[in-house]
């Protein structure tokens, strides 16, 4: 019988191996101890309000310049205008209380301007080298406008065809998903996060999001612990070992506990068993949605439970901003939890080299959607094609055929050729059949 006690013994035995890998992981920066010392000095200077500000992510649609200037925002989501990003970073480093740069985040799922096949198509190539190269293209293009963090790859295992986000996944197999996820992480983060064309990756959605009951998005998932460890956690563990910079908790609940308040997943497994020290971010307003789950009474309760469980940064909702100071002052939340979360966030910013180079020089990057990038995208698309059945030997087509009719309402729609989850492409760059 599989039980937590047995697992605890197992992980204690292999813990030195995991710790060694963490120490020599491919993106572990030189001078890690020096970075920790810098974080110590910075934390000692910061007020509680300053620290809470680092834990808050706001939407770029709000363009909250005053909040950035006041040090009340640690990250901006969905900002893509390079001039506005530059203005935000200048405010953060030149006018905020401690000059801490911003994490600029964007969903760069299968390309930024140059669009590659959807993740399910990427998995169908079985070509990790090509996937890594494509992810590097996406990172370079995104970094050229000032983005330094993306919410991908998604590594949710789904075996229910009714689930609506399968296109964003690498499919139903945990081994293939692990291989593809690691390839994308290496492409996005390069071998050194301080490189100008590297951005932080994000392993999402932790964990079991694709196993929702009835294939319904956001639905709760019931997963026996053995299945959780042998299937659903595998890609995340591989990503942690590969040095992924961040991880996103899911909207859903696992075995009755929402992911954004699940200390067994976020503290026991992620932090203690795996010894991972990256940033854990909530999904969009998922901390406040703990109320909708029926798990929390109000925003104050949600902020308390989320931080205790291990959420470092709150995406878009404002429960941390509104209630954490009160919770710490009343003794309901230990200040050490706040310091730990902020340490993780500051470490990522140091690892990205943002304190040294917060403002991007677009001239150092290749042209977006250049010929080489397009050739790579086309090569990936060709390799992603899967033939399930060749009825009556229809393929290969005769060389004597001169014209082929492509029929359907979307056959000549340039946007629909791009697949789901694309935001920043130029439609004129899209080529229909």
Language-model-detected regions and their locations in the chain:
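Bacterial Sec-dependent N-terminal signal peptides
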Residues: 1-32
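Glycoside hydrolase catalytic-domain context in secreted enzymes
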Residues: 26-433
């Amino acid at each position: 019988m599989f039980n937590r006690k047995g697992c605890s013994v197992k992980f204690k035995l292999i813990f030195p191996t995991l710790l060694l890998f963490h120490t020599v992981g491919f993106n572990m920066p030189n001078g890690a101890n020096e970075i920790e010392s810098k974080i110590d000095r910075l934390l000692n200077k910061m007020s509680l309000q300053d620290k809470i500000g680092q834990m808050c992510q706001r939407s770029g649609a709000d363009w909250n310049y005053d909040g950035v200037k006041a040090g009340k925002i640690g990250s901006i989501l969905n900002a893509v205008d390079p001039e506005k990003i530059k203005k935000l970073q200048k405010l953060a480093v030149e006018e905020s209380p401690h000059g801490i740069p911003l994490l600029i985040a964007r969903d760069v799922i299968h390309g930024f301007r140059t669009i590659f096949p959807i993740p399910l198509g990427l998995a169908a190539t079985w070509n990790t080298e090509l996937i890594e190269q494509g992810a590097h293209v996406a990172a370079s293009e995104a970094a050229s406008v000032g983005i330094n963090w993306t919410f991908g790859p998604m590594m949710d295992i789904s075996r229910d065809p009714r689930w609506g986000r399968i296109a964003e996944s690498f499919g139903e197999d945990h081994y293939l998903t692990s291989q593809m996820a690691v390839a994308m992480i290496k492409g996005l983060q390069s071998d050194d996060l301080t490189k100008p064309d590297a951005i932080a990756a994000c392993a999402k959605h932790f964990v079991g999001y694709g196993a929702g009951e009835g294939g319904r998005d956001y639905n709760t998932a019931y997963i026996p612990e053995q299945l959780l460890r042998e299937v659903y956690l595998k890609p995340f563990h591989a990503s942690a070992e590969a040095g992924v910079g961040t991880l996103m908790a899911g909207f859903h609940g696992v075995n009755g506990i929402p992911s954004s308040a699940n200390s067994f997943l976020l503290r026991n497994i992620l932090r203690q068993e795996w010894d991972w020290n990256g940033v854990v971010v909530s999904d969009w307003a998922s901390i406040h949605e703990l109320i909708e789950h029926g798990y929390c009474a109000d925003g104050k309760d949600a902020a308390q439970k989320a931080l205790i469980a291990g959420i470092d940064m709150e995406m878009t909702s404002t429960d941390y901003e509104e209630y954490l100071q009160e919770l710490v002052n009343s003794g309901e939340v230990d200040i050490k939890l706040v310091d730990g979360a902020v340490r993780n966030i500051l470490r990522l910013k140091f690892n990205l080299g943002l304190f040294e180079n917060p403002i991007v020089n677009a001239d150092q990057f290749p042209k977006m959607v250049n010929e080489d990038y397009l050739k790579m995208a086309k090569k990936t698309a060709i390799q992603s094609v899967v033939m399930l059945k060749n009825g009556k030997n229809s393929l290969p087509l005769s060389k004597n055929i001169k014209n082929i009719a492509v029929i359907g309402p979307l056959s000549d729609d340039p946007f629909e050729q791009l697949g789901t989850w694309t935001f920043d492409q130029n439609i004129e760059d899209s080529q229909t059949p």
